[in-house]
Amino acid sequence: MSLHSAIMKLEPIVEVYDNDIGVKLTYNGHNYYGFAYCHKEDKDFFSEKVGATIAHYRAMIKIYDDEIRRAEVAARVLWSAYKDVIYNSQNDGIPVDPTSAFITRVFKARDLVDRYKAQRASLRTQLREYLKNHEKCLESIRAQRKTENEDKNV
């Protein structure tokens, strides 16, 4: 199972604190938290669903951050071992086959890091789009309320 599908299958635990939302995801025995805070000027627009969605995205991004760190460490270890093999083969005079399974593992480890970064970037883009669309919705509601208040005052 890929990391992305594993993250999507996680069951979020949502907690509401006044007008702020917290989401907890448990992945590989670790807890990852995401929070969404409601601005004091937007308290009348508070929505638990919107806050939970934002907090859920943030928790998923934190899982990716952690997995990227782990994958980068593994890739660095493999790359370091490969450089040691190359260095030692130059001293021994024994040629190293660059198509070996080991170098393939090195490149696969690096590819995994790049794939995780692309998926994390996709999640961040989705979150930005969600926030931008939500802000457009709030702006239209504010404008409508402003015109309604002006009509009442006339």
What spans do the regions from the language model cover?
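Catalytic phosphate/metal-binding cores of nucleic-acid and nucleotide-processing enzymes, i.e., regions
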Residues: 1-149
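Juxtamembrane, membrane-proximal amphipathic segments and lipid-exposed surfaces
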Residues: 150-154
